[in-house]
């Protein structure tokens, strides 16, 4: 029940030239420009195929992008070659970042919380605080999956071929299994369930919140400063 099949079924989520990716970039670009004055070194954490890494590079940043998936990094490097990009793509563990202390002006963490269990996210936030400069900023964007669950239970259509046929939360709703159905097949994926309150409580162990705003009904954009 990993994400490999999920990204295979929904290729628009990993194709930086797709309409879906373009919409995500258009929604976030004004916020990134507002809260990230141009210039400096940025870590794009859990970068996937690099769509936001390339955006940040276009905005004038020196970008290092990290992911633990060989498949995602291979695609990212193909896109980078096609674009003539100088983004440095690194394979690594977000829980133990391969970078020195105080080495980044910004760390961005975009729409990746579903991949992280509570202990993993705690370690990741701690590492982000370590690698950020004292004057640095942590940019966090996430979907409140806990609030979204009732919507998903109504058989939400996903993409052009699939719909969610079953929603199976565990007893304490820390994870949920979503069953995706099409005319040809079905498959299941397990997501970690993060709500806004839980994210903020964990982040405040290591950061001071400077800004928070709702992007849409279930999505949030937040800015934090390290407690240094």
Regions found by a protein language model. Give the residues of each.
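Core SAM-dependent methyltransferase catalytic element
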Residues: 206-208, 213-228
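Conserved class I S-adenosyl-L-methionine
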Residues: 1-37, 55
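A short glycine-rich, Lys/Arg-flanked "PGG" loop and its adjoining helix->strand segment in the class I
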Residues: 122-134
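A short SAM/SAH-binding and catalytic strip from SAM-dependent methyltransferases
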Residues: 106-120
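A short acidic, Gly/Pro-enriched loop at the edge of an enzyme's catalytic core
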Residues: 95, 99-106
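Class I SAM-dependent methyltransferase "Motif I" SAM/SAH-binding loop
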Residues: 46-50
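SAM-dependent methyltransferase
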Residues: 139-198
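Class I SAM-dependent methyltransferase SAM/SAH-binding core
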Residues: 51-95
